[in-house]
Each structure stands twice: as C-alpha cells, then as structure tokens.
From Swiss-Prot:
Compartment(s): Membrane
Reactions catalysed, as given in the entry: L-threonyl-[rhodopsin] + ATP = O-phospho-L-threonyl-[rhodopsin] + ADP + H(+); L-seryl-[rhodopsin] + ATP = O-phospho-L-seryl-[rhodopsin] + ADP + H(+)
Gene name for this UniProt entry: grk7-a
Subcellular location, principal: membrane
Propeptide stretches in the record: 549-551
Catalytic residues identified in the record: 314
Family: Belongs to the protein kinase superfamily. AGC Ser/Thr protein kinase family. GPRK subfamily.
Positions carrying Phosphoserine: 36, 487
GO molecular-function terms, A-Z: ATP binding; rhodopsin kinase activity
Name of the molecule in the record: Rhodopsin kinase grk7-a
Lineage: Eukaryota, Metazoa, Chordata, Craniata, Vertebrata
Organism per entry: Xenopus laevis (African clawed frog)
Modified residues annotated as Cysteine methyl ester in this record: 548
C-alpha cells in the first residue's frame, strides 16, 4: 500500500529544498517578476515620507543598510568626505585583524594617513590630535588611532550628513522608504511546508516573491490567541523582535495579518536546533570546539538582549537554531520580558531543568537567570543531559527542582575540560550575585578562559568560520505527518477592539531586515540602475512559481 503520509512529506521536502536552491526556472520567474517593479516617484516619496523620518545620523547612515549604502555613495562624490570614509574603513579593517598582520596594518595606516598623507590630510583631526599623532611612539599609536576614529565619525555626523540630506542620494533613500512601506499580505509570499508548531499556531517556510528570500513564518491563530488571552504576549514578542538587531538572534522581517492569522516572518534557520544535534546525531553531546563556538555566539546574543533591558527567560538548546553556514541564533522570544526600574519580576517562566533557583523559589529575579540557563545549556551540550537530571533514570519535576535549589553540579563526563567545569560552576552559582555575568556591573562572561580561542570582535563581524556546516540536502525538521494539526477554535467572535489590535500588530516590513534583504538579493542594484526600465504590472500577483506548483 502506498504511504500517502510519506509521499506528502517527500513532495513538501522536495519543493522546500528546490526553493532554497533557486533553480534555473525559479531564477527566470524571479527575473520576470522583478521587471514589473519600480520605485515610487521622487515627488510622491518626498511628500509622503520625508515628514515621517527622524533625521538621526545613527539610524539613517549606520543602522539602515540602504541608508548606509546611499550615504557612502554620496561621500564618494566629495573628496574630503571620501577621505574620511576610507580612513574609517581602514581603521575597521585594522581593528578586526589578528597577530602580526594587525601590527603591519597599523604601520601601513599610520604611514599612509598620518606621516606622509599623499592622498590628502585628514582635516577633521584638528591641530592638537594631529600634533600628538606626529610625535607619538608606536606603543601609543593604537589609542591615538581610536581617537582619530572618533573624530572621523563626529565629522561625518556634521556637514557631510547635512549635505547628504540635500542631495539626490537622500531623495533616492526616500524613494526606498516609500517602497519599504508598501502593504504586506499573504500574496507577497509563496508558502511551503510546515516546520513545526507552537502554542498558538504553526511555523512554515515561506519565500518572498520579488526577491526569492526564504524565511520562517510563525502563524498565530487569531481565535486561539483570543481564547487563551495571548494577545498581550504575542504583541510583546513582536515588539521585542522589532528592537533586536543582532547576528546572534533571529531577525523579524515582516509582521502582517490574514483573515485567520497574525504572522511573524523571521530568519529561516535550516540547520536544526542544538537539542537535535545533542541527541540525534551520533553519541549524545557535541564536540567541545563546537560547544565553545556556539556558547560564544549565545553569550553575544544574551548580552545584546540585556543591553536593551530585555530578559530572555527561555535559554535552552532547543531554542538555539543553526543557519546554513553553521552559525547559531537565539529564537522564540515568547517568554522574553522588558526589565523596568522599580517593577520586580516574580512570575515563574522558563523550562524545567533550566530555571534558576530564584525563579523556582518565587523571589524577585532579573538578568542572572539567563546566565544560569546558559550554564545548564553548556553542561547539556557537553554531557548530553542537563546538570540536575540523572541520565540513567527518570527524574521527576520536583526532584529536578530540589537538585537545582540545593545540590552542587557534578561533572562525570570525561569531555569536560577544567575551563568548561569552571564556567559551568560560575554560571550555575545558586546565588545570583555570585553568578558569572552578574558579580559586578562589568562582569563579562566573554573574558572567561573557556573562550580563550575566540576573537569576539571577529566573531561579531562574521569573520570566524563555524566548526560545523549543516548538510544543505537535509531538512532538519519533523515529518509533516508527525506535526499534529490544531483543532478548530469555535465560539470566538471578533469586535472593534480585536480589529484595532490586529492593525497594531500587522505593521508590514521591518526596515533594517527588509533593507538587508533588498541589498543581499540584488534588488537594490537592479532598481537603482539608471538604464533600467520597469515593464509595469506590479510585483505581488498571486501566481505560483514553478517550485510551488507541485504543492
């Protein structure tokens, strides 16, 4: 007898993998669709957009990818501005270099820009700083280069930024902002197989029709949300994801609604979660060099959340996902909460086996709980089980709670290095004030000897190769037949209050993520080509691509 469930899964996986590869037929379909696209006219974009934009240098010229790109293009038209921009790029290259190569780069930079500036003087330095640099010894030069960097950034924020606002490059930025704010609905995407499910709905793979970019779409059932009073939690997750822009945390790209669902479109992580890699590939556990690499990236992600006054509360390997290249990101911020002065957090939240003693004993808690869960996760990646569960027998929830509160961690697995034992002990300290990351205001876990092989500047710049790369021909997700369907929610009706909530949630494209997608997929260069002409017709029709026709 034909296994229809297996056939359905095969078809869904084939379509999904084909979309990820961008076959020749898909490329032709994409090119055809892009020909119909064009930017809004300059007059329209100026009128509708200019008044809504806050003229903030950091936001426009640094954080927003298209703003940054157009600002750099503008700087290239004025020799003095171009010189400053090139100098800052050279400083950035020097900061990210290692060993003797870094020393050589510094000597080259000093000679080229300070000692014998054949390409022109850096006038923004001022007489005092220029004099100090000219008289400085080599040992003092790194500090002076950083002062020169600060002076260069301050210079670009002044006259160059003002001139940029009166240039055609800024007009083009406004056109892109108008394009960015186009309405987003389900016709903007192709939908593929289900990847999993959560408390309020399912997660599926989707593809943007105009760019070919793949994402994961978290679909929250409107009726289920209302029935379970989950609206506030869903909106909080969305608002937190909007604020977060880190290579170590999943990014939110779009928020839109359908008739039945609220949809969060986020980074698609094809490599599976760390729980899968701990328990389903070879012997339980992960080799130590991978543990160090993932832990370093996780630390960066947690520190980014804390810098935004956000408490994660659900750190565990299951919520750490790998991308195509083997880099990891934190996911599922459904339990995350904003930390507010004078408002203690006491609600029990998290996953059994990862919750800190202060959560389990119902006292006030804050950022240290994330570091406790980090210690549990490092231990689990190495040992193949969490620190307060007996791997040889079933441990009750109450026993895990007792051990977490009372027992010291024991290291029986032979793979634990001394550095690994030490960082786990420090993260798993019972008292939050004794916990690594929380002992002082500047207690940075990245400085621990466990991470001695990691250059964090290069890691954050994406310049460190992951020790493991997922197989691109594998779908790291359950078979679609193993993902249970949701039952229909009955007896729920929507009113004006619900409609207002849906509108507040469905805000469309998220600027930084959307702009990155536009640049990475080549659409920015295509639509900026002065010789290009759009053929008209709009770009979001409901036609299915060849990839999707077998679904």
């Amino acid at each position: 007898m034909c296994d229809m469930g297996g056939l359905d899964n095969l078809i869904a996986n084939t379509a999904y993998l084909q979309a990820r590869k961008n076959s020749e037929g898909d490329v032709k379909e994409l090119q055809k669709r892009r020909k119909s696209l064009s930017l809004p006219s300059t007059d329209v974009s100026r009128k509708e957009i200019k008044e809504t934009i806050t003229l903030d240098y950091q936001s426009i010229c640094v954080e927003q990818p298209i703003g940054q790109r157009l600002f750099r293009d503008f700087l290239g038209t004025v020799s003095e501005y171009k010189l400053a921009e090139e100098f800052l790029e050279e400083v950035k290259e020097w900061e990210l270099e290692e060993g003797s190569a870094k020393e050589q780069l510094m000597e080259k930079l000093v000679s080229r820009r300070f000692k014998e500036p054949a390409e022109g003087s850096l006038n923004f330095l001022g007489k005092d700083l220029s004099s100090r640099i000219q008289q400085a010894q080599s040992k003092d030069m790194p500090e002076l280069i950083l002062l020169a960097k600060d002076a260069g950034n301050a210079f670009l924020m002044d006259a160059p930024f003002q001139d940029f606002q009166n240039s055609p490059f800024y007009d083009r930025f406004l056109q892109w902002k108008a394009f960015e704010r186009q309405p987003i609905n389900q016709k903007y995407f192709y939908e593929f197989r289900i990847l999993g499910k959560g408390g309020f709905g399912e997660v599926c793979a989707i593809q943007v029709k105009n760019t070919g970019q793949m994402y994961a779409c978290k679909k929250l059932d409107k009726k289920r949300l209302k029935k379970k009073n989950g609206e506030k939690m869903a909106l909080l997750e969305k608002e937190i994801l909007e604020k977060v822009h880190s290579p170590f945390i999943v990014s939110l790209a779009y928020a839109y609604e359908t008739k039945t669902h609220l949809c969060l479109v986020m980074s698609l992580m094809n490599g599976g979660d760390l729980k899968f890699h701990i328990y389903n590939i070879g012997e339980k556990g992960i080799e130590i060099k991978r543990v160090i690499f993932y832990s370093a990236q996780i630390c960066c992600g947690i520190l980014h959340l804390h810098s935004l006054k956000i408490l994660y509360r659900d750190m565990k390997p299951e919520n750490v996902l790998l991308d195509d290249n083997g880099n990891c990101r934190l996911s599922d911020l459904g339990l995350a909460v904003k930390v507010k002065e004078g408002k203690p957090i006491t609600q029990r939240a998290g996953t059994n086996g990862y919750m800190a003693p202060e959560i389990l004993t119902d006292v006030d808690y804050s950022y240290p709980v994330d570091w406790f869960a980090m210690g549990c996760s490092i231990y689990e990646m190495i040992a193949g089980h969490t620190p307060f569960r007996d791997p040889k027998e079933k441990t009750s929830k109450e026993e895990v709670k007792r051990k977490t509160i009372e027992d010291e961690v024991v290291f029986q697995h032979p793979v634990f290095t001394e550095e690994a034992k030490d960082i786990c002990r420090l993260f798993l300290a019972k008292k939050p004030q004794n916990r690594l990351g929380s002992r002082t205001n500047d207690d940075d876990p990245r400085k621990h000897a466990f991470f001695k092989s990691i250059n964090f500047q290069r890691l954050e710049a994406g310049m460190v190769d992951p020790p493991f790369v997922p197989d691109p021909s594998v779908v790291y997700a359950k078979d679609i037949s193993d993902i249970a369907d949701f039952s229909e929610v009955k007896g729920i009706e929507f009113d004006d209050k619900d409609s207002k909530f849906f509108k507040r949630f469905a805000t469309g494209a998220i600027p930084i993520s959307w702009q990155k997608e536009i640049i990475d997929t080549g659409l920015f260069d295509e639509l900026n080509d002065p010789s290009r002409e759009a053929t008209g017709g709009g770009g979001n029709s409901g036609e299915k691509s060849g990839v999707c026709s077998i679904l």
